Amino acid sequence: MLGKLEELIGKICSDTSVAKADFQQGYGYGYSFSNYNTDFFTAWEMSGYYRFSWSERHPSEQFTMDTRNETLASYVLVTQVGALRRARLRQRPIVIPGEAPSPQQWTIADTRWPRVKRYTSTTDPTMVVESVNSLELRQTLFATQFPLEDYVDSFMDPDANPVLSPYLSSVEPHLERLRDAGVKLPTDDSY
C-alpha cells in the first residue's frame, strides 16, 4: 500500500537531505522522516490503513491519524514531509491554517475510542480519516481543497506557487514589533 506513494515520497525528498528511514517494529512497514534527528514524522501501513504519528525524540508507533484513502494519505505526506523539505532547503515556511473543519465539508462522528473521531468528506465519502483533533489533522483537511498536484508543486516551489503563496510565513511582522519596542536590529542603519 505505501508502495503506491513511493513516487510522491521520492519527489518531495529529492535534492534534500531529509532523512527517510525504514520503520518496522512489528507495527507494519513504513518510513520515518526527520531533518536533524528530532521531530520525527512516521508513516506506515498496517492492516489496510495508512497510519501517521509525530514525536520529538524517536519514531513512534502511537498513531495520531489513520486512513484507508490514498489521496488523503498523500495530503498528509505532502504537508508534513514538504515542511521538512522547505526547512532543509532554508525556504520560507508555508503555514497551513489549522481551523476546525467546516461541517459543510466534513462530517464528524464518534468512534469506539474516546478522543478519536471519524472525519468524512461531504463531497467524497471515500475520503475518511480517524484522528484525534490535532493541528496536523486540521491542516490536512484544509489542504484537500487544493488539487493534489498543485499542492505538491507549491511545496516544491520556493515561492509556494501555484496555490500556497498566500500562506508563506514572514518574519517581518515580528521584526517590526521588535523595532517598535526599541530593539536595534543588525539591518537597521543605527545598529
Regions found by a protein language model. Give the residues of each.
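Short aromatic-glycine-(Arg/Gly/Cys) micro-motifs in beta-strand/loop hairpins
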Residues: 34-62, 174-187
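Generic surface-pattern signal
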Residues: 3, 7-18, 78, 82, ...
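A short, charged, amphipathic alpha-helix used as a generic interaction element across diverse proteins
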Residues: 68-81, 137-148
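N-terminal "first-domain core" detector
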Residues: 1-49
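Short arginine-rich
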Residues: 78-103
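Ordered hydrophobic segments in well-structured contexts
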Residues: 30-32, 40-42, 51-53, 76, ...
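Intrinsically disordered, low-complexity, charge-dense segments enriched in Lys/Arg
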Residues: 99-191
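A short, exposed loop/beta-hairpin motif centered on an aromatic-Gly-Thr core
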Residues: 58-69, 129
